[in-house]
């Protein structure tokens, strides 16, 4: 039987890799140190695959086709999507390995368990959503990925409750197969930030710290109770926290936030977190 052996979550601001030097040295060191610790823990868990949950910045989807959830089933993924984005993010363009069989299993399991995600069979190109965090978490791209997209960019969004339950479904899907034994989940996005708006560069530290308290509590209801209006107060980009909420549902355990820093130079409240099943309360 497969098992989710760990879950991680991290911000994916382009500034983390594209212009890290603009942040205050103390804040940069804290975030990069947290990424290094998360990478160490992932390697120690020896995963056979990583379920990577993020949002999609219109690299593949658009306003005319914007699913609440989407599951990709390719055996490789291009990222960053263009040479220009590669230069912007300071991430070398390359192919990330995928586990298409596990992705297909999760999709079919979801359909049989009251979820109706979109199926992406033809590949899914990456932008900062996966390229930024995985430059730190898996710089050699040695772990096969199952990319999953949660709509966190434009309403109507899936509810926080539905996002958490989607994560719980992922756990059951992994446990319902035995081809891949050890699976890690990584959610990326958030925390507070505004994209393409006059408020860009602001950070809602109050929201961020409240979110951290909730995700460290291990109490599902504290995460599932978020309303879109509450999240709106932290910026249109804050809706990406649904990826963290889904990761929390997948692991069913409290997270340890390894670092949090409000970094206006990166346009984001930036955090890295980790959880393992043995941390259950």
Question: Whereabouts are the PLM-identified features?
Answer:
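Short catalytic/ligand-binding loop motif for oxyanion handling, primarily in non-cytosolic enzymes
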Residues: 58-62, 192-196
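Glycine-centered flexibility sites
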Residues: 167, 187-189, 269
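Beta-strand elements within well-structured catalytic alpha/beta cores of enzymes
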Residues: 48-54, 148, 181-189
